[in-house]
Amino acid sequence: MKRLSLVTTNRLSPHGNFLPLCTFPLAVDMAALFQEASSCPVCSDYLEKPMSLECGCAVCFKCINSLQKEPHGEDLLCCCCSMVSQKNKIRPSWQLERLASHIKELEPKLKKILQMNPRMRKFQVDMTLDADTANNFLLISDDLRSVRSGCITQNRQDLAERFDVSICILGSPRFTCGRHYWEVDVGTSTEWDLGVCRESVHRKGRIHLTTERGFWTVSLRDGSRLSASTVPLTFLFVDRKLQRVGIFLDMGMQNVSFFDAEGGSHVYTFRSVSAEEPLHLFFAPPSPPNGDKSVLSICPVINPGTTDAPVHPGEAK
């Protein structure tokens, strides 16, 4: 079963059937609370016949036997907080069952309302790839918009900003404030990482894509496993395979959102994105051992229009 990653009220915005950009972070905060309360930490699905543990966490009735047992005993360990619950003190939670049921009923309406706001494209940025940061296994197009992995290392200068082990590259320009939107054509690629990162991230040695290390990325593996770089990973569900990914960065609200740019549906939003230092687009195609030589491309800006907000220093013009 697929679950929404965004929840809001059923009141339509004055901009049509789309959320105003200023309310997007609030809607995402609401979504996190609803998701946490209505989903099972064992099966990651909506709670069915939820059972409340002594610690206050809840799991589906069918998932109770999947919980780890206490060593040398029959009591159960919560998979969220590792607290022990006695079997005879686990009780049904009717309130959570009603909440999960209501969210499931609202899902079709929410999907229709929570599509990508076309106004985001007014903030579309003309971006290119920064060749000085590219790993030497990457092959970059002459216009600096497309990249794929090769099997032969390129003879590039050894620069401090270049990634020497991990197969990735950053984008230009960097961002220090404002709102910015761009799209990446991932085509039929079965593996990629997209998002933003701090300017100060480590470039040498193998990197780990986590928010704690300054990476706010969405990743695809094996053609179908989609995840966000939270700790622990957040696994994502989409109705269709992503072929063009839209990314909206709002430095003022400290969030970055990912969309299916063709279908218009919301994929995931990171909150509390650090704005203390410049951020760069992060871009990683399939690595050479994968055998996938798909090209990932930054889509050109087409009639971006003008923004409602003034352009500030550090913002792309």
Swiss-Prot record:
Q: List each copy of the B30.2/SPRY domain by range.
A: 107-301
Q: Name one GO molecular function term.
A: ubiquitin protein ligase activity
Q: Which domain of life is it from?
A: Eukaryota
- The keyword Cytoplasm belongs to this UniProt entry's keyword annotation: yes
Predominantly, its location class is: cytoplasm
One protein family per Pfam = PRY
Q: How is it modified after translation?
A: Phosphorylated by PKC and CDK1. The antiproliferative effect seems to be positively regulated by PKC phosphorylation and negatively by CDK1 phosphorylation.
Compartments, as annotated in UniProt: Cytoplasm; Nucleus
What does the UniProt entry list as the effect of changing S200A? Reduced phosphorylation by PKC, increased cell proliferation, reduced apoptosis and lack of cyclin B1/CCNB1 and CDK1 degradation
Which GO biological process entries does UniProt record here? innate immune response; negative regulation of G2/M transition of mitotic cell cycle; positive regulation of proteasomal ubiquitin-dependent protein catabolic process; regulation of gene expression
**Tissue specificity comment:** Seems to be expressed in prostate and less abundantly in adult brain, fetal liver, and fetal kidney.
Tell me the SMART domains matching this sequence.
PRY, SPRY
In the record, the effect of S287E is given as: Increased cell proliferation, reduced apoptosis and lack of cyclin B1/CCNB1 and CDK1 degradation
> What keywords is this UniProt entry annotated with?
Cell cycle, Cytoplasm, Metal-binding, Nucleus, Phosphoprotein, Zinc, Zinc-finger
Q: Which residue spans match zinc fingers labelled RING-type?
A: 40-82
Q: What does this protein do?
A: Negatively regulates the G2-M phase transition, possibly by promoting cyclin B1/CCNB1 and CDK1 proteasomal degradation and thereby preventing their accumulation during interphase.
Q: What is known of its domains?
A: The B30.2/SPRY domain is required for the negative regulation of cell proliferation.
Protein name as it appears in the record: Ret finger protein-like 1
Q: Which organism is it from?
A: Homo sapiens (Human)
Taxonomic path: Eukaryota, Metazoa, Chordata, Craniata, Vertebrata
Q: Which gene encodes it?
A: RFPL1
